[in-house]
Amino acid sequence: MRLPCLKACLPILALTLACSDSTSPTELVSGTYVLETVNGQGIPAIFSAGPADTSFMLSATLSLDGAGHGLRSEHWRYVFPPNQVQEGTFTMPVEYRIDGDNITVGSFQPCPANALCEGNKVGKFTSTTLSLSYETTSTTPVFLYRLSPTM
């Protein structure tokens, strides 16, 4: 009696396993993303502007591996009175977490006492884009990254 039941259940089990998705969520977003726009403005773009100073995002990349780790690199220019300009590149290792089509990029460790820590970026991803903004404020810029084609 058990053998016919086993024979009937094995094909169902095999079909179920064959149809399951073996791609983990982190593998879905792995790759190098290139910043395309900030608040819909093409790069270089104004990142923030005050009465006397302006910050520009000149370029940026976000490289994510399939294990929840990545590297963020941003090249910026800061203009302030009287006609002063500073330019630099900010590079930082990051982690990321995925929940459905939502992604959080940054650090998941507590900020050390007396340290200046940047908040995480949160957003959505598709098969070719990441749309991110800082999670701590509603007036933050929106950064749109596009997946760079692999060579």
Language model region names:
Residues M1-C9:
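Bacterial N-terminal signal peptides that target proteins for export
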